Amino acid sequence: WIMGHMVNAIEQVDEFLNLGANAIEFDIDFDKDGIAQITHHGIPCDCGRKCTKKAIFTEYLDNIRQVTTPDDPKFREQLVLLALDLKLQRISSAKAYRAGEDVAKKLLDHYWQRGNSRARAYILLNIPLVEDYEFIRAFKDTLKNEGYESYNDKVGINFTGNEDLDKIRDVLEILGIHKQVWQADGITSCFARGTERLKEALEKRDTPGYNYINKVYAWTLVRKSIMRRSLRLGVDGVMSNNPDRVIKVLKEKEFADKFRLATYNDNPWEKFRG
């Protein structure tokens, strides 16, 4: 999975897909009451990027629904995963539950259209810190209360704050989540990051019977040397400001026979068995 990073303006969706991404990440900004308002990162952000691009969240969902719906004029077959980077760290943890309710309802109304949409992308909920786990509880409660629990099959969980992996496991245990879990490891493209935690996550992913990590990705990679390093370690995905660079690296002799781009037929919740 090549995840285009910080794709917050509607016009950026095609831009990143044209560069080779098969997944996009966008930031969800909330008001003080936990209501999702816009797709927006804000300052500071990655080096070399404009931090202020944005869209109304519901309008963004309406557009991305079309982009991921077969036979729609806007349909782009390659886009199979949407990562919602939830900026919960900007609001009180007491509002995390309200935020989870709101995002679930907006996805129901504008993306899935309560069963009337054929939009097919998988959804990855990126939670910044484990203290915000009530967002996940609320999201799942809302799908159940609204009568659409089946959409849980399309939704995965990912904690992005580089916290202790055992601490993350404990929170997932509290929530009763034993599947559909991704684990991110990374830092803004402005800085270098070691591989200790990334290697630990990959080791846990590959441990038989360990159900708290199905996929691991590294972020935000812009240098080809770091992309190569991550691929050699065996990551499932790369988040990048430059998907075209990832494509070029994947075509190199060292990687061409080991990796390919994920398609809709690849289940993002299953561990890869090479």
Swiss-Prot record:
Cofactors, names only: Mg(2+)
Main localization (coarse): secreted
Catalytic activity: an N-(acyl)-sphingosylphosphocholine = an N-(acyl)-sphingosyl-1,3-cyclic phosphate + choline; an N-(acyl)-sphingosylphosphoethanolamine = an N-(acyl)-sphingosyl-1,3-cyclic phosphate + ethanolamine; a 1-acyl-sn-glycero-3-phosphocholine = a 1-acyl-sn-glycero-2,3-cyclic phosphate + choline; a 1-acyl-sn-glycero-3-phosphoethanolamine = a 1-acyl-sn-glycero-2,3-cyclic phosphate + ethanolamine
Cellular compartments annotated: Secreted
Catalytic residues of the enzyme: 5, 41 (nucleophile)
Enzyme class: lyase
Gene Ontology annotations for the cellular component aspect, listed alphabetically: extracellular region
Binding site for Mg(2+): 25, 27, 85
Cofactor note: Binds 1 Mg(2+) ion per subunit.
Tissue localization of expression: Expressed by the venom gland.
Cystine pairings recorded for this chain: 45-51, 47-190
Purpose: Dermonecrotic toxins cleave the phosphodiester linkage between the phosphate and headgroup of certain phospholipids (sphingolipid and lysolipid substrates), forming an alcohol (often choline) and a cyclic phosphate. This toxin acts on sphingomyelin (SM). It may also act on ceramide phosphoethanolamine (CPE), lysophosphatidylcholine (LPC) and lysophosphatidylethanolamine (LPE), but not on lysophosphatidylserine (LPS), and lysophosphatidylglycerol (LPG). It acts by transphosphatidylation, releasing exclusively cyclic phosphate products as second products.
Protein family per UniProt: Belongs to the arthropod phospholipase D family. Class II subfamily.
Protein name, UniProt field: Dermonecrotic toxin SdSicTox-betaIIB1bvii
Organism: Sicarius cf. damarensis (strain GJB-2008)
